[in-house]
């Protein structure tokens, strides 16, 4: 039987009243569960309490948009190169072996696989790294899938503003493969800490300059149409006290850890203990890559993800060491 349009509407109303059909609301596009891109920003020498004393609207915004803790721990010794090696390898210092803190080319490269290698092998991810200190080159192995940019702190123009601008410019000009994993080191706060003292006015001013630079970076990702598909992780290699660091003092060991992006809880305060070492596995989790095998101590910070209930830990984290 053919039902004409007016009769069709009346029939629908009758069926609705009888509870035999339901109105279907338009389905909104589901938010992505995983990130297409991950940006890890290591703010050299950033103490958590500096975020309360300095004006940091960009980092405050990431904290509100994502998950964070101000009680994360770096590794011992609390020095830049060993800490960066731990963040990138997912291993403590005594296992990755990079226990020095100066650029010494004859020592060669870290022997353990790093996050760039793991992401490239398991997810075909291209990478980009932007360094403010040459000594971190001990952790970065040259690869055709990796864009490397070093802007030395010995050059006056090499500040956070320039480096974050380089990140956006490099993405725009990349031709062979667009980076998906970015690691950015910003040393402004550390330089001010060594020169004028941690928590001094110049140090807090440097923290504010870094915050503005990160804001420029976020805007660049928005302009490129990448922001909503990108997870941003901001942390530090160490804190500092007086004009130094490297001890087991809480001022040196405590660091912030912030993550915001697809599939990450908003306004969430992380409850579990967090180590800088856990950054590597959390990056892989943010990409949605869980089937990989690497012998590391890094564990994803599972509670920050909206699908954390019943989630499976990376297979590599469950296998015993050989």
Predicted features, each with a name:
Residues 84, 88, 248-291, 302-308:
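Substrate-binding rim/cap in mid-to-C-terminal beta-strand-loop elements of soluble/periplasmic
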């Amino acid at each position: 039987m053919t039902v004409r349009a007016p009769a069709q509407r009346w029939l629908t109303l009758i069926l609705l009243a009888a509870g035999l059909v339901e109105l279907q609301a338009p389905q909104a596009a589901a938010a992505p569960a995983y990130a297409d891109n991950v940006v890890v920003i290591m703010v050299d020498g950033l103490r958590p309490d500096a975020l309360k004393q300095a004006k940091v609207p960009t980092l405050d915004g990431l904290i509100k948009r994502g998950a964070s803790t101000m009680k994360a721990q770096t590794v011992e010794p609390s020095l830049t190169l060993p800490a960066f090696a731990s963040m990138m390898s997912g291993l403590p210092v005594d296992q990755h072996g990079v226990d020095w803190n100066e650029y010494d080319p004859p020592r060669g490269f870290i022997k353990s696989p790093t996050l760039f290698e793991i992401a490239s092998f398991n997810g075909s991810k291209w990478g980009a790294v932007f360094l403010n200190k040459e000594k971190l080159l001990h952790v970065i192995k040259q690869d055709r899938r990796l864009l490397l940019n070093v802007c030395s702190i010995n050059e006056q123009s090499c500040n956070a503003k320039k480096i974050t601008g380089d990140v956006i410019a490099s993405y725009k000009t990349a031709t062979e493969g667009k980076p998906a994993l970015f690691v950015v080191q910003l040393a402004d706060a550390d330089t001010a800490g060594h020169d004028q003292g941690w928590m001094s006015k110049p140090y807090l001013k440097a923290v504010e300059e870094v915050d503005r630079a990160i804001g420029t970076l976020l805007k660049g990702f928005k302009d490129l149409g990448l922001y909503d598909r990108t997870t941003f992780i901001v942390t530090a290699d160490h804190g500092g006290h007086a004009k130094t660091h490297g001890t087991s003092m809480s001022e040196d060991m405590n660091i912030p850890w912030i993550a915001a992006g697809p599939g990450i809880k908003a306004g969430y305060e992380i409850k579990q203990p967090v180590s800088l070492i856990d950054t590597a596995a959390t990056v892989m989790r943010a990409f949605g890559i869980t089937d990989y095998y690497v012998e590391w101590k890094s564990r994803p910070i599972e509670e920050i993800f909206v699908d954390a209930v019943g989630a499976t830990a990376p297979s590599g984290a469950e296998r015993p060491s050989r």
